[in-house]
Amino acid sequence: GLFLKDQSLQPQMGTLLAEMLVTMSDRGPDSAGIAIYGDDGEVSSSAAKITLQSSAPHEDFVDLAADVAASTGMDDSKVSLTVKDTHAVLMVPAGMAADVRASLDEIRPTVRIMSVGEAIEIYKEVGLPRSVAERFSVSRMSGTHGIGHTRMATESAVTTMGAHPFSTGADQCLVHNGSLSNHNSLRRKLIRDGVHFETDNDTEVAAAYLTHKMQQGASLGEALESGLDDLDGFYTFVVGTRDGFGVVRDPIACKPAVMAETDQ
């Protein structure tokens, strides 16, 4: 992850993040992904970004903005779509995000939602980190902070949806190095609490657990503290939010974490 103190560096966020991603290629050659948080000039509390993924983008993304507007009763001018390879960012009024998500299930059932929020965009695909970064032109992106991940699959299949980051809450995401041993029991409990899952990946369970805790009123720090008691296994998490990110390791701390701070 990378958080910029120096606002003049925000236009370079994508370049810096892509370089970090490529450097980690040997660690995770199966798939790669990033979450990038838009700079202050791009973020508006009156609009929501919904990042989408499709295995057939030339079909699913055609006329999608107009179809969303029609199905939700919005004016066409309130909806816009920016396509980037297999992903697209749908911009809608913030108060309509939930309606749009429900609409997408009906009008584009094969489209998957990567993230929702005012600032976050998530891009992830199967392939070497350099290839993924080039497909989405990551080096051209700007932002305040970002998180990347290169994957070597251990808990689930090598798929786009199994790649990291995972997002289970507004402007939230999580990447993970390690393996959870109680993710199936936690998944069942969270499902009973109304949480929906897209994959059988253990990392999605960790992300959903933290989101659920925060929706119940916990701060990010409090949610991470609870996770030390409730999440079994070995792990290092980087958790992104609208304002920054947090890092936590399991009590045994067998997975490394390297952190550094500069004036920039």
What are these model-derived regions, one by one?
Residues 1-264:
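Conserved short alpha-helical segments that host acidic/polar catalytic motifs at enzyme active sites
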